[in-house]
Amino acid sequence: MNEIKLGKKISEGKTVDVYESGDLAVKVFKPDAPKTVVFYEAFMDSKVEETGLNVPKIKEVELIDGKWAIATELIKGKTLAQIMQEEPENCDGYLDDMVELQLEIHSKKVTGISKLKDNLRAEIESLDVIDHIKRYDLLTRLDSTPKHVKLCHGNFGPENIVVTDDNKVYICLLYTSPSPRDMR
């Protein structure tokens, strides 16, 4: 394993900052990030890799200056959000493309990672700003939703889709995480 040298910061978030490092994108977690969260995220991203979806592949997990980091392939290109801003006349077509990509994501079955339904249940149960009647209503509605192990991105949008110069489309997993509370 080579020591990673961080280059230009390409993204900044509440719990992670992302840097370029040669042909890698390095997601550096804030100092208080538990090791378990970092390794679970790397595990989840690896499970998504196994589906065959175009996602940046994980190359390593390591400590950098006392902070945990996940290094993946650096995908050079523009986000679909940037392209849509540059070509507003083509937005309808890009939205159709997003729907197809979303359907492709949802067609993948993944086992061994936390289920969105379980995460939502925990979130609802932890809310102290709603009364027990509203909590019961929300949990009942959640229980009525289908049970399956299909993949869900968690924050799917044009800013999380990268299109390379040769029109290859990659799904950015920077926002994949086990709990909506952990969203960056």
Language-model-derived ranges and their functions:
Residues 2-20:
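ATP-binding glycine-rich phosphate-binding loop
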Residues 14-37:
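ATP-binding glycine-rich loop module of kinase domains
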Residues 36-47:
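The N-lobe alphaC helix and its flanking beta3-alphaC-beta4 segment of protein kinase-like domains
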Residues 59-66:
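Short beta-strand micro-motifs within the conserved protein kinase catalytic domain, predominantly
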Residues 67-78:
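Conserved short submotifs of the Hanks-type protein kinase catalytic core
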Residues 81-114:
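Conserved kinase catalytic-core helix
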Residues 107-154, 164-165:
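An alpha-helical support segment within catalytic cores of ATP-dependent transferases
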Residues 175-184:
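Single conserved hydrophobic/aromatic residue that forms the stacking wall/gate
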